[in-house]
Amino acid sequence: PIIEFTRALVPEGKNIHAFERDGAKPTVTKVANHNELHEHITAKVAALQTEQHNTIAIICKSAAESAAAYEELSSIEDIKLVKSTSAEYEQGIVVIPAYLAKGIEFDAVIIYDASKDVYSNESVRRLFYTACTRAMHELHLYCVGEVSPFVLGADSDSFELITTP
């Protein structure tokens, strides 16, 4: 299900040959504000840990967004911030900018804010695609406000849209 979803994120996606990953259909959760975003991500991380996912990445667009997200999510036990100066990648729960996640795979990936405000410029489409394809088994996208147009280009059957009350 993840590959089907991510192929639709880039124009040449149908030509991409990737290994199929087992796992659930990706979810896209719309939240009203950043407080709600942090509550939902904290709860999702706890659920993923219960499901025995050993590597969980919260992927952000930039290093600045990663640092801010790390501060807001610091209540999550053993969470780590990966920076360009990090000596090596550590397993567990990490907050990481998308450009540093390239080449690394995680059991579960949470896209920190896949909103139109963050991911709508064509220049970041490949970065968004790269972030989403880091997931081996579970992919969860969260949006504060409107969903990224990149997501809206995917077949609505390829993901589950969740709108919080």
Q: How does the language model describe each region?
A:
Residues P1-N33, A63:
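Conserved coupling/interface region of RecA-like P-loop/ASCE motor cores
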Residues I3, T42-A43:
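Short, hydrophobic alpha-helix immediately C-terminal to the catalytic nucleophile
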Residues E20, N35, E39, A46-H140, ...:
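Core RecA-like ATPase module of SF1/SF2 helicases and allied nucleic-acid translocases
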Residues T27, P149-F150:
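Short secondary-structure boundary/hinge segments and terminal tails
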